[in-house]
A protein has these predicted regions:
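Residues that form or flank phosphate/diphosphate-binding pockets in enzymes
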Residues: 107, 201, 389
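Acidic surface patches and DE-rich sequence motifs
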Residues: 65, 116, 155-156, 202, ...
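Short beta-strand segments and strand-loop junctions that repeat across beta-rich extracellular domains
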Residues: 113-117, 154-172, 206, 312-320, ...
């Protein structure tokens, strides 16, 4: 009687709307490529969230400030250094952040506001008219960054970007402050730095600018590097993030159906699977523009997290050697969007903001709950052929014993890849029982095809691997 191994890293089913085959992504579970008990890897629940502190509002942005060796976070109408307030921030939308030796800058409400470490607050503006220096049409700030000794910001709705003065950061450079990304006539959507380049992200191109080294008064300090230009654009200001020594971004619909790419040496590499592109395609251009991307690293996982209005998707570079490995995160027992955002390593823990409440949290690896609420974890197997066969002993390896009370695993089967039947409850965790078997002894007769879904609702961490069945 043959025993068949079933992979859990990615299930396969059908879309009932168009009968296409789709991937069923793991939900709240991360794949770990490590040889465990005849399996090439195992799946581990995403770390839970515990409350850390009350703050002024929902999270709007975060940055690690190297000059102060502290995390600066904008929550509601306040700027926080660690857990202490250091300033007021106007507005309620997402903000851009950068920092230098003397100040922490926040791009908010069309202004570049500098919160100096001596307690004063300055807003970037033109030099006094009687100074004799050039007066610029600064317009509205869209995105900010910093390279070497200067802040740089993009002017909303134009292809212009500016740099601050070396001596006084609250004014533009006195001689050569304004530059243009001329391949982006519809405007610079976002700006960033990579190595020693200023990177301007448009809707159809990504341009790089490098220092010229000029010291002559009035000479251009930055010049475009056309050899590094990329013929893709980004969907929104925050649809980009440094990742894997480069940038990852969601492409703009102006260059075709949106996807997720990583930039490398003047060209882009797609990392999205067909199912991820289907999800991105379900959003309008305006909805995609509201997306936020961030990167996170822990326990050898290199994660790219994409926050969309109705989905939170996670790409794991460390598990993607045999093809892109994605999973989904969610909050609650239904399809509510994942609530945590703005992850950053702080002290010896990973802290995060919140999309729903005025709190900050911290990731805990010994739980899978979110603010003491149980979470649902889903895994799927691919459809496989078992023509007129009897199936016994569906077994999953589970690392057990750490639960506070007996947890159950819900198993259900599908024969068409769309509808899953009645769930079978199996105890899968129990306090101090470290070798508990998760076994469904009699599955039944299969007419043609079959696939399985595993569902766990718990506060405890979940570790599953090695799904197998016996076929007669």
């Amino acid at each position: 009687m043959p025993i068949q191994q079933l992979p859990l890293m990615k299930g396969v089913g059908k879309d009932f709307r168009n009968a296409d085959y789709i991937d069923y992504l793991p939900v709240n579970m991360l794949a770990t490529p490590k040889e465990i008990l005849n399996s090439s890897g195992y799946l581990r629940s995403f770390p839970g969230i515990a409350k850390r502190s009350d703050v002024n509002g929902v999270s709007r942005g975060v940055e690690y400030n190297m000059a102060q060796s502290a995390v600066y976070r904008v929550c509601g109408g306040k700027l926080y250094k660690g857990e202490s307030e250091v300033g007021d921030v106007a507005g309620s939308g997402r903000v851009s952040m950068a920092h230098g030796r003397t100040s922490q800058a926040v791009g908010v409400n069309g202004q570049l506001v500098e919160y100096r470490y001596d307690g004063t607050v300055k807003t970037v503006s033109n030099w006094p008219a009687d100074s004799g220096f050039t007066q610029y049409e600064l317009g509205s700030v869209r995105d900010i960054t910093r390279l070497r000794g200067r802040y740089a910001w993009s002017k909303d709705g134009t292809d212009s970007w500016f740099i601050t003065d070396l001596e006084d950061e609250s004014h533009p450079d006195r001689y050569s402050a304004q530059y243009r990304a001329e391949s982006q006539p519809d405007g610079i959507i976002g700006i960033g730095t990579w190595r020693d380049f200023i990177v301007c992200f448009g809707s159809s191109t990504i341009e790089y600018f490098s220092l010229t080294g000029a010291t002559t008064v009035g000479a251009a300090l930055y010049v475009a590097q056309p050899s590094l230009m990329v013929q893709k654009g980004i969907a929104g200001t925050y649809c980009k993030t440094p990742f894997a020594d480069s940038y990852a971004f969601i492409s703009n619909p102006a260059t075709g159906a949106p996807s997720v790419y990583i930039i490398g040496s003047g060209q882009v590499s797609p990392i999205a699977s067909a199912s991820i592109e289907k999800i991105l395609r379900s959003y309008t251009a305006d909805e995609l523009a509201d997306g936020v991307m961030e990167s996170l690293r822990f326990d050898a996982h290199e994660l790219l997290i994409i926050h969309l209005p109705r989905h939170v998707l996670v790409y794991d570079a460390s598990s993607s050697t045999n093809g892109p490995q994605w999973c989904a995160l969610k909050t609650g027992l239904y399809d509510d969007v994942y609530r945590a955002i703005d992850f950053i390593y702080e002290g010896n823990q990973i802290t995060c903001g919140d999309k729903l409440e005025s709190v900050t949290g911290k990731l805990q690896f010994d739980i899978s709950s979110q603010y003491d609420k149980q979470q649902e974890h889903l895994l799927f197997t691919p459809l496989f052929k078992a023509d007129n066969a009897r199936v016994f002993d569906l077994e999953v390896e589970s690392s057990t014993g750490v639960a506070q009370y007996a947890d159950r695993l819900f198993l259900s089967a599908t024969t068409d890849g769309i509808n899953y039947g009645r769930e079978q409850m199996i105890e899968q965790n129990e306090p101090f029982v470290y070798d508990k078997r998760v076994l469904w002894k009699r599955v039944g007769r299969i007419r043609k095809n079959v696939g399985f879904k595993l569902r766990v609702i718990t506060k405890s961490p979940v570790t599953l691997s090695g799904c197998q069945i016996r076929i007669e």
